[in-house]
Amino acid sequence: DYSFLCASFGQGYRNPSVVEKYLRKDIGGVGVYPNENIRAEKGYNAELGFKQGYKFGNLKGFIDVAGFYTRYKDMIEFRFGLFNNKTFDYIDGLSKLFNAFSSGDGLGIGAQFTNVGRAEIYGVDLSTSGVYEFNRDTRLAYTLGYVYTNPIDMDVDSRNAEEEANDDLMAMRSKSDDSKYLKYRQKHSVKGVFDLEWKQFNIGTNMSWKSKTLAVDYFMVDERTKAEPNLMDYMRSMLFGNLHDYWAENNKGYFVMDMRVGMKVTKNIHVQGLVNNLLNKRYSARPMDVGAPRTFILQVGANF
């Protein structure tokens, strides 16, 4: 009983949003730059899954297993770097750098959305959720999940060869390494949510673990091994200090745990205390984006 088999296939395209194509804005010294030449991304997605219910005594729930595959053409992603403040050109060579200075257009640091070419993302999603009834007043609800993702840049070989042949001192690369992976992705992700209820009281926790980030923007970090520093290494040091060393030491898998304790004061009023990042773990999924430290929150909810 309670067995389900599902499959899906979809195909379509997505036009760039107004923000991705036209927005120009400065936020805290970092700019967002428009790209009117950005193209719509196209692709298709296929998924096959199986869902099975289970019941063992007072324990009941579902387990869900799904495999997915997505293929993109002209995939849209953002790139971080230097830009001409007037023409919004991405600075990827000495000539563009000198032109920005000589023309008086000026330079800015920021992000711009662009097409990265062909990509495929596939993986497996495993999850289970259920409830265990201890007695009439006590129950434990849980959700456990694991996701494996393999995000592949299908044009990596030709792009690496083109970038390697470029001997411009200010030549930019698409990402921080020569791997086949897309930027800002993690291969493995694990989560767990548990909530124990007893009469009007409840205590719960959220736990998550993610593996290291596979690649980031070259403008901030270069993970390649070099005999001597190049011009971009000196520029990074001036702009971002020891960010390169920090990322090399801290780009690892990280575990974060949150806790919460609550009570129903009346039928309509609920009070809950939360501690986010209980272990005060220092973590970062992207350079210059450090996760929030331990945080205490008190919530009061009312239904009328």
Regions from the language model: what does each represent?
Residues 1-46, 67-111, 213-214, 280-293:
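Surface-exposed extracellular loop regions of Gram-negative outer-membrane beta-barrel proteins
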